[in-house]
Structures are given as structure tokens and as C-alpha cells.
Amino acid sequence: MTLYSRPTCPHCHRVRLVLAEKGIAMEIINIEGSKLPEDLVELNPYNNVPTLVDRELALYDPRIIMEYLEERFPHPPLMPVDPVARARFRLALYRIERDWYSLVDEIEQSPGKPHVRAKKFLRESLLAAADAFAAKPYFLSDEFSLVDCSIAPILWRLPRYEIDLPAQAKALGKYAERIFNRPAFKSSLTELEREMRDAA
């Protein structure tokens, strides 16, 4: 099993976090620069990462990869068993991608630009969801889940994006610290991702 990843990509980070939480041993090929390995170009028509290769199977959407890993390696579980609860979690994953990752992608695609609009909307959207982070130890749950795996890379990058959260977002800050202190989160970080916080 092989994961093609970039060392600073937030989408790759959330897949790496799932791997770390589940203790899955996997070859991770870190791609730096614009040139992609030839085998990746052949496997993935979109030429992007993360891309997971498991024997004859090649997956190249982060959410599909995360759910595949959850089903292939069910322990520890990162999704609830109940179908209604699973549907709620899937909807949360969809909204995180649509509402937050769309803005993150805008910021990440041209890091030299100010991206005032995207940063403003991301900050406001996180603040609007702040109460959801106060209700339980993890997002919508007492247990760590794929939803948290998707949120954590965004929160880790806020200083890099020059997004500061006000005092009233204390619950969000505490939630972030809970996740950042998890051993799996620490081991999911690449050297360049560690430097994002060291430099902030």
C-alpha cells in the first residue's frame, strides 16, 4: 500500500492523520516540486495528491481514501456504527470540504497573494461553528473521528494563513489543542508542517 503525498498539503495531511490514528504501516512517497512521478501520472488522471494505491486499486479523492481506510482497517473506529449517525458525519465531511476546504484551496493555490476574502470567510465560518466545538470533546462526538481528521489540518495552518481567532473562540482553541496533543497527530506531521507552527 502506497500513499503519494505532498509534505505541506492539507488534504494529504488529513489522510496521513487517519493512517497515524489507525497505526497503518504504509509507504509514503513525498512529492516536492511540480514534477510528478511517472507511475502517479499513469494511475491518476487528475495528476494530484493524495493518491492511495492498494494493489490494483488507485484512489485520488481524500474523502474517499479516508472512508476506504476506515472500512479496510475498522479498528480503532473513526466513524459511528449507527447508519443515521454515519450519515450525519458524512454530511459534516461534505460541508467541511465545501465550506472550509474550498477557501483553504484558494489560499494554498497562490501562497504569495493576500487572499483577504478567502481568509475573512474562513475565519467567519470557523467562528460561526464555534459552539459546535464546545458541546463535546470532539466535533459532534465524544470520540475522535474522520471529521476531526479533516478539521485538524485546517486549524494547524491558521497561523500560516495569518488567521487569528478572538477570545470568544476559546472552545475552538481548546478543541485544537486536544487534537494537536494526540500522539497520532504529532506523528502525522511532516517536518515542513512542524515548521509552520515554529515559524508562526
Role assignments for model-derived ranges:
Residues E70-P74, E97, A134, P159, ...:
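Hydrophobic/aromatic-lined pockets within catalytic cores
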Residues M1-A130, P137:
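GST-like domain detector, emphasizing the conserved glutathione-binding G-site
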Residues G33-S34, L172, E193:
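Conserved beta-strand edge residues that scaffold enzyme active sites
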Residues Y175-A200:
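Long hydrophobic alpha-helical segments typical of transmembrane helices together
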